[in-house]
């Protein structure tokens, strides 16, 4: 049985999301949720989770280039993951998101130039990259 996985790219102002199927290992961007100092509108996230009914949530874990925690944002991303798990009673995994934003900007620019580089687009594409990277890690 293939699982549906939803991923989040946590940020203090915007949280990107993506959805994917384990059987295909591919992901598609969904929505960027505005956040107020890292706190999203939980009702909007709940609506999306009810609509897509994922079996698992993956949250990008921000680290530096060497995989070390970043002082301010890493603990907040972990807290967001804990809140997702507590609110929605779904399993949540953290996944390294190193360079996902850089890669997202590059992919979006190649598809649509500067116009494609809106904050929401970048955050959702980052969530796609996080999820596809998570799929790759599962398959070794």
Swiss-Prot record:
GO MF annotation terms: nuclease activity
Any one annotated GO CC term: cytosol
Keywords: Cytoplasm, Hydrolase, Nuclease, Ribosome biogenesis
Keyword Transferase: no
Keyword Hydrolase among record annotations: yes
Compartments, record wording: Cytoplasm
Main location: cytoplasm
UniProt xrefs under SMART domains: YqgFc
PANTHER family: POLYNUCLEOTIDYL TRANSFERASE, RIBONUCLEASE H-LIKE SUPERFAMILY PROTEIN
Family: Belongs to the YqgF nuclease family.
Function comment: Could be a nuclease involved in processing of the 5'-end of pre-16S rRNA.
Protein name stated in the entry: Putative pre-16S rRNA nuclease
Organism: Vibrio vulnificus (strain YJ016)
